[in-house]
């Protein structure tokens, strides 16, 4: 759970880290439930169809569905990233690649280390189009 990772220092963010400091497990579960029920909107981003196709191919090649399941819907502690903001996906993948983010037991760091900037761009285009 991302909130726990902020609280325990496995993820760092100047805003989120202090906000999670006093949260109980029940508080975090309540917040997670609330946000998981919100409908994602991504009206401003216009994906490039060619990049989406390349993103689908790269997702298949790197076996993203093994952890994130089909269409990046997530499971257990593996987050749903379908429909996530393009810029967030790019930043997250680059952070894993640079080992600036390490709350993944090494899985995402390992996968991201194989991605080029073009791969990251294409994956972000694809992921941002999913619901």
List where the protein language model places each region.
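A general structural signal marking secondary-structure boundaries and capping sites
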Residues: 10, 38-42, 71, 100, ...
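C-terminal capping alpha-helices of c-type cytochrome domains
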Residues: 21-43, 87, 113-131
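Gly/Gly-Pro-rich "capping" loops immediately C-terminal to redox-active cysteine motifs
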Residues: 1-13, 17-22, 71-98, 109, ...
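Sequence/structural segment immediately N-terminal to covalent heme-attachment motifs in c-type
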Residues: 43, 47-70, 85
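The canonical Cys-X-X-Cys-His
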Residues: 31, 35, 61-71, 123
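Extracytoplasmic c-type cytochrome modules immediately beyond a signal peptide or single-pass transmembrane anchor
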Residues: 1-51
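Conserved hydrophobic/aromatic "anchor" residues
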Residues: 6, 34-35, 59, 96, ...
């Amino acid at each position: 759970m991302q909130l726990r990772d902020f609280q325990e220092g496995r993820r760092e963010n100047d805003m989120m880290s202090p906000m999670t400091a006093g949260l109980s497990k029940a508080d975090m579960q309540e917040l997670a439930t609330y946000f998981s029920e919100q409908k994602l909107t991504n009206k401003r981003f216009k994906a490039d169809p060619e990049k989406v196709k390349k993103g689908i191919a790269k997702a298949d090649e790197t076996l993203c569905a093994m952890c994130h399941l089909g269409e990046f819907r997530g499971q257990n502690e593996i987050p749903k990233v379908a429909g996530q903001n393009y810029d967030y996906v790019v930043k997250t993948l680059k952070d894993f690649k640079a080992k600036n983010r390490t709350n993944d037991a090494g899985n995402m760091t390992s996968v991201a280390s194989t991605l080029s900037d073009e791969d990251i761009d294409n994956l972000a285009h694809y992921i941002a189009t999913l619901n």
